[in-house]
Amino acid sequence: MSAGRLNKKSLGIVMLLSVGLLLAGCSGSKSSDTGTYSGSVYTVKRGDTLYRISRTTGTSVKELARLNGISPPYTIEVGQKLKLGGAKSSSITRKSTAKSTTKTASVTPSSAVPKSSWPPVGQRCWLWPTTGKVIMPYSTADGGNKGIDISAPRGTPIYAAGAGKVVYVGNQLRGYGNLIMIKHSEDYITAYAHNDTMLVNNGQSVKAGQKIATMGSTDAASVRLHFQIRYRATAIDPLRYLPPQGSKPKC
């Protein structure tokens, strides 16, 4: 399945999720071009997410959302101006081919969301997205894996971990190959990366356990599934919420 063009809603969700995928996910790459902000207003640049802006400005995601009337899944658009809650005038380094003028901000990135704020186990039922061996667990470290990587033979079926609506099918996010994202509620999104064949379309409703793809190695060193569960834009440890492999959830 070829990647389709993104609508605004899907693009916003991709921008949101890309902070985990592009800045701290399995590719480990970071954006080399960041924006600037002055006073208490930040202008959204290409590739920004609410979480990335939070880290840059020191304003929490919750506060940014409150000040700007943004609801989950926290969609933002290029050029949008965001209030920062009275932040002091600051600017951050920006690489450019124009004159070399570099300013450095004295802002402290916000810390990772503590586990105490994660949803309680059993609040929602999740199914394993595939069968296989977990070769890379979730990590809370900066630059660590914000999901789990599961290895199995090429073509192994991949299933929706829960019922929901497909909000992205494509390969525009570098380092994640053929990627599918499913929105399960206003709070939860799951992501399935490195697929071989993708069997769903944008906007399609899926059932829990429905086959959505086959395992592949697109943009990966080996055949694997990179799987994420995101709760209110924050990546949480899937192993904490999935039942033991081979068993049904008890919730």
UniProtKB/Swiss-Prot annotation:
| Family membership | Belongs to the peptidase M23B family.
- Name listed for the protein in its UniProt record: Uncharacterized lipoprotein YgeR
**Which Pfam families does the protein's record reference?**
LysM, Peptidase_M23
Organism expressing this protein natively: Escherichia coli (strain K12)
> What topology in the membrane does the UniProt record assign?
Lipid-anchor
Where in or outside the cell? Cell inner membrane
User: Is Lipoprotein tagged as a keyword?
Assistant: yes
Q: Entry's CDD domains? A: LysM, M23_peptidase
Residues annotated as signal peptide: 1-25
Q: Region Disordered: what ranges?
A: 93-115
Keyword set, alphabetical order: Cell inner membrane, Cell membrane, Lipoprotein, Membrane, Palmitate, Signal
